[in-house]
C-alpha cells in the first residue's frame, strides 16, 4: 500500500494582488499539520503503508503498479485535474475511486428534489439538465479561494475516466460533516473499473 501525498508546494492560485511569499509559508505549515495527522493515524493503526510525496502530474515509476487508486477530494485542488487523473490511471490495474465535493447549487437542488427516486434516476436527471461540466472557482475580486480551482461534476469525471480506460463506473452520493464550517457537505463518489487493458509500455 502506498500513500501518495501532495508536496507542500502544491498548486496555489496565483492571485496577482497577493504576496505569495507571505501566505505560501502558512499553507506549507498547514500541509505539515496534515502530514502529522497522517503519521499519528499511521502509528495508532500500525499501518504498513508507505508515504511518498510528489506532484500528481508525474508519479514516479518507483511507486509501481497498484490494484486500486483512491483520490479523496484532491482534484478540485490541482490546476490540471485531468492530467492528475491520467497519471493515476497510468499506474492502476483495476479500479479508480474518486470522491469529491458536489458544491454547485444547481446540482445540490437536483439531488434534494429527486434524491428520493434513487441514484439511477438522479443521475439521468443530472445528465439531462447539467451534463459533464466544470466551473472555475477562483475569484480575483475577493482573492478567494486560494487552494480550490474547480468544481468538477461527477459526469465530467466519469467521462474522462472512460477516456483513460475505466469505462465501467457507478456514481453514489453522501453527506459528510465539514468541521471547519460546522455544516454537512454533499459529496459524490465514482467507482470506475478498468475496461481497456493497460499498455505494454506501462507494464
Question: Language-model features: where?
Answer:
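Conserved SAM-binding loop
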Residues: 1-17, 21-107, 154-158, 192-194
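S-adenosyl-L-methionine-dependent methyltransferase catalytic module, highlighting the catalytic core
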Residues: 57-58, 70, 79-200
